[in-house]
Amino acid sequence: MIKQRTLKCIVQATGVGLHTGKKVTLTLRPAPANTGVIYRRTDLNPPVDFPADAKSVRDTMLCTCLVNEHDVRISTVEHLNAALAGLGIDNIVIEVNAPEIPIMDGSAAPFVYLLLDAGIDELNCAKKFVRIKETVRVEDGDKWAEFKPYNGFSLDFTIDFNHPAIDSSNQRYAMNFSADAFMRQISRARTFGFMRDIEYLQSRGLCLGGSFDCAIVVDDYRVLNEDGLRFEDEFVRHKMLDAIGDLFMCGHNIIGAFTAYKSGHALNNKLLQAVLAKQEAWEYVTFQDDAELPLAFKAPSAVLA
């Protein structure tokens, strides 16, 4: 059978919090089968757990948060969640000694390296996927996102940014998902922001960790980072990275075709909730062997070596 995945060992890293600008220690721990993805704040006494759950997601101006019933939150979970989706990690406990996951370089790549460093272990329990059975679409003004049935996981994302740094030919990206494709084509794409927004937020004591080290920064005309872009279409690739993380908030890889136009965290989450709320639109599936499994979810050679 296709088995659930966790880590082989505990790994730790430090980074800077986007909001506070303070050092954050991140610890990733293996977890037993059917645990799911658990985010944990150890700076609170007692520590507070936040299971990844579409209904717990709140989108703020700066990041995605998970919020519990007591309005306690953990922030900036989206890029780590994308790395978990990319490598198909089903069970993990993620600890931080702060109210937020460190921003690292603004992409998912540092988290991918950390997960690969820990090693991926298979558990003796069938991995559950969410398979889309009917088309589900959500809209917000001219923005929209939808899932259609498809035997794999495909993504097609279009942005509409009227900015000199973003050529019109670099506003759409489409791919057939796989762990290898995610690592090569998506994981390194960084988040982005306007210099004026960062300066304004920092003047109000917000976004204190924001810098050229953790984002693509633009003014009205150009990219300000000395090293430029990692891909010509890094902006839309990062929006796809965000979507991969947002859609994994149900704790399962999804089998279906995702298409979006100008979508963001809030609309991606709205789509996920709309799918899960419509019982006839999806089903849980497991697979007995590799031959049945959609190519999208075969483990990359580097992972289970």
Swiss-Prot record:
Q: What is its EC number?
A: 3.5.1.108
Which GO molecular function annotations are given, in alphabetical order?
metal ion binding; UDP-3-O-acyl-N-acetylglucosamine deacetylase activity
Annotated binding of Zn(2+), by residue: H79, H238, D242
Xref: InterPro entries: Ribosomal_Su5_D2-typ_SF, UDP-acyl_GlcNac_deAcase, UDP-acyl_GlcNac_deAcase_C, UDP-acyl_N-AcGlcN_deAcase_N
Q: Which cofactor does it need?
A: Zn(2+)
Q: Does the keyword Metal-binding apply?
A: yes
- Which stretches are transmembrane? none
Q: Which UniProt keywords apply?
A: Hydrolase, Lipid A biosynthesis, Lipid biosynthesis, Lipid metabolism, Metal-binding, Zinc
UniProt GO cellular component terms: membrane
Q: Which GO terms describe its biological process?
A: lipid A biosynthetic process
The active-site annotation reads H265
Q: Which reaction does it catalyse?
A: a UDP-3-O-[(3R)-3-hydroxyacyl]-N-acetyl-alpha-D-glucosamine + H2O = a UDP-3-O-[(3R)-3-hydroxyacyl]-alpha-D-glucosamine + acetate
Q: What does this protein do?
A: Catalyzes the hydrolysis of UDP-3-O-myristoyl-N-acetylglucosamine to form UDP-3-O-myristoylglucosamine and acetate, the committed step in lipid A biosynthesis.
Name the family. Answer: Belongs to the LpxC family.
NCBIfam families for this protein: lpxC
UniProt-recorded name of the protein: UDP-3-O-acyl-N-acetylglucosamine deacetylase
This protein's species is: Escherichia coli O45:K1 (strain S88 / ExPEC)
